[in-house]
């Protein structure tokens, strides 16, 4: 798909009736901050310039770019996590 990371997360949350900003940096301040140790499926995992949705068991789903589309990744800590946000 042509979705970028924040467009993907905005789309998923909109499906559940939750409106969030369409820019990754703005998504860092929505909802309630929780620690990564307390992350639950559906939480936003925010990185520098990127955002993903936590699936549980250390896994995320995110838009990786036009070459890859929407992908699951089994290592949420593959880069430094800026914040974890809970909206649900």
Regions found by a protein language model. Give the residues of each.
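Secreted/periplasmic proteins that engage bacterial cell-wall peptidoglycan
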Residues: 1-24
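Residue "hotspots" at secondary-structure boundaries inside conserved domains
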Residues: 1, 37-38
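Aromatic- and glycine-rich peptidoglycan recognition patches
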Residues: 18-37, 49, 55-88
């Amino acid at each position: 798909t042509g979705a970028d990371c924040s467009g993907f997360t905005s789309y998923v949350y909109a499906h559940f009736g939750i409106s969030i900003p369409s820019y990754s940096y703005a998504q860092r301040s929505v909802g309630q901050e929780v620690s990564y140790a307390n992350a639950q499926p559906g939480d936003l995992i925010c990185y520098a310039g990127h955002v993903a949705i936590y699936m549980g068991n250390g896994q995320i789903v995110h838009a990786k770019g036009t070459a890859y589309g929407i992908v699951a990744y089994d290592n949420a800590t593959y880069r430094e996590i800026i914040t974890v946000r809970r909206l649900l």
